């Protein structure tokens, strides 16, 4: 399977660390993996495509959608996995234009505003890394039914690879 992970990439966070562990496992299983991110500091065998997803300016968002659309088509991506609000926003539109499967993981409590309270840019299925985040989205937004939002905890690699 060809998988594209999309992250904001404006600073190192837990989402990058846990995504790196997921990517390593996906590659170990034989999947082809790409990362679109402003920066990705963890060593990885995935192909990293630098795109300033963190830049939320309107023009930049349209350019990011175009760049993601090009990657999805060029690399025959089967699924896009977004890991931040900004990543979810641009991934949602790129996947709509390309008819590509899509999901998001919510790694932290969401800063809610009109658009993400009433408009689901996170995809038809979404993972939250803990019950607190899942509960926030179910209680404070109108975008999810309970069965659309599952808790999947971040995995960690316990064996050091030195």
Residues covered by each model-derived region:
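A conserved, positively charged/aromatic
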Residues: 96-131, 143-144
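Carbohydrate-associated surface elements
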Residues: 132, 155
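N-terminal strand-loop element at the rim of the active site
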Residues: 5-63
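Glycine-rich phosphate-binding loop signature in dinucleotide/nucleotide-binding domains
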Residues: 71-78
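Short beta-strand scaffold positions
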Residues: 35-37, 81-82, 128-129
């Amino acid at each position: 399977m060809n998988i594209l992970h999309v992250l904001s990439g404006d600073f190192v966070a837990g989402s990058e660390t846990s995504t790196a562990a997921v990517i390593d496992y996906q590659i170990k299983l034989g999947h082809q993996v790409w990362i679109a991110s402003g920066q990705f500091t963890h060593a990885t065998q995935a192909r990293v495509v630098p795109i300033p997803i963190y830049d939320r300016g309107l023009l930049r968002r349209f350019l990011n959608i175009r760049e993601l659309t090009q990657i999805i088509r060029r690399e025959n991506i089967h699924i896009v996995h977004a890991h931040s609000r900004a990543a979810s926003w641009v991934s949602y539109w790129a996947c709509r234009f390309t008819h590509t499967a899509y999901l998001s993981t919510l790694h932290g409590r969401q800063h809610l505003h009109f658009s993400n309270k009433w408009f689901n840019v996170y995809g038809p299925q979404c993972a939250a890394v803990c019950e607190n985040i899942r509960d926030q989205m179910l209680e404070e937004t109108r975008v999810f039914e309970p069965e659309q939002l599952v808790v999947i905890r971040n995995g960690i690699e316990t064996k050091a690879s030195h």
